[in-house]
UniProtKB/Swiss-Prot annotation:
It is found in: Membrane. The chain crosses the membrane at residues 2-22. It holds the Pfam family Band_7. Keywords: Membrane, Transmembrane, Transmembrane helix. SUPFAM superfamilies: Band 7/SPFH domain. This is Uncharacterized protein MTH_692. SMART domains: PHB. It comes from Methanothermobacter thermautotrophicus (strain ATCC 29096 / DSM 1053 / JCM 10044 / NBRC 100330 / Delta H) (Methanobacterium thermoautotrophicum).
């Protein structure tokens, strides 16, 4: 009974030692009697207990935080720089057998190459060229760690800190630049405002002039229309008179009567002296005849028509 129990316990220990589980992000390097045997994927792995051993390798992306260090730039300025490195294992065999302490190895390698890269740059270039420094450092580290079975995914510079006096000088310079930029923007805004105002005044003057011109044109058109209407009316009136005279065949008595009405309008009741041509005596004679016809026979001796005739003045020849 005791022997059977011992056999069961031995079998359980052998089963526990022979079965290994690798997670999805892991790979394993199997060694047999201290010698590389094979590389296994994630899942359940069976090994020979006490003869074979397995070393697990994490295949996920990992981070190395490089400690801050002082670096001298090309113009002999001391700056404090630190960075982080993101890497992943691509070859478990090289990662296990080609480097003892990968974390310490890549840290020292990053610090050394960071000093070399920044040592070729001046302070201004160092402060404004982070992306370039990241790219160069990643390429150098990726090439150097290739034999370790790793790939450097990216490098990020976290801090570039110049000395305090330089920081103060840079702060003053930045403040002056901001004030200069603000003054330029203010002047540019005032300039644009004045341009817009001038354009608005110009447009208003143009619209006002166009409005006045349009009003003058409309007044002129109205006067023109009125004059044309008056002229057309007068023309029609004259045409009607001539037509009536032509159709009615007026006598000298009617003409003389109309002549008398015209003289009355000309005189207009004022003390006016009218000079008549010699040819008008015939018409006045007709008027006298009309007056005798219209007057009462008893009054013929009382009324008189005085006429004054005077030859028409002829213009002097010069």
């Amino acid at each position: 009974m005791i022997l059977e129990l011992i056999i069961v316990l031995v079998l359980l220990v052998l089963a526990f030692k022979s079965l290994k589980i690798l997670r999805p992000y892991e790979k394993g390097v199997v060694e047999r009697l201290g010698k590389y045997q094979r590389t296994v994927e994630s899942g359940l792995v069976v090994i020979i207990p006490f003869i074979e051993a397995i070393k697990k390798v994490d295949m996920r992306e990992q981070v190395v935080d490089v400690p801050p260090q002082e670096v001298i730039t090309k113009d002999n300025t001391v700056v404090v720089v630190d960075c982080v490195i993101f890497y992943e294992v691509v070859d478990p065999f090289n990662a296990v057998y080609n480097v003892v302490d990968f974390y310490q190895a890549i840290t020292k390698l990053a610090q050394t190459n960071l000093r070399n890269i920044i040592g070729d740059l001046e302070l201004d270039q160092t402060l404004t060229s982070r992306e370039m420094i990241n790219t160069q450092l990643r390429e150098v580290l990726d090439e150097a760690t290739d034999k370790w079975g790793t790939r450097v995914v990216r490098v990020e510079i976290q801090r570039i800190e110049p000395p305090g006096d330089i920081v103060e000088a840079m702060s003053k310079q930045m403040k002056a630049e901001r004030m200069k930029r603000a003054a330029i923007l203010e002047a540019e805004g005032y300039k644009q405002s004045e341009i817009k105002r001038a354009e608005g005044d110009k447009q208003a003057a143009i619209l006002e002039a166009e409005g006045k011109a349009e009003a003058i044109k409309k007044v002129a058109d109205a006067n023109k229309y009125r004059e044309i209407a008056i002229a057309e009316g007068q023309a029609k009136a004259i045409l009607s008179v001539f037509r009536a005279m032509h159709e009615g065949d007026p006598t000298n008595d009617i003409i003389a009567l109309k002549y008398l009405e015209a003289l009355e309008k000309v005189a207009d009741g004022r003390a006016t002296k009218i000079l008549l041509p010699v040819e008008a005596t015939g018409i006045l004679g007709s008027i006298a005849g009309i007056s005798e016809m219209l007057s009462d026979p008893e009054d013929k001796g009382v009324s008189e028509v005085e006429t004054e005739s005077q030859p028409a003045e002829k213009p002097e020849k010069h």
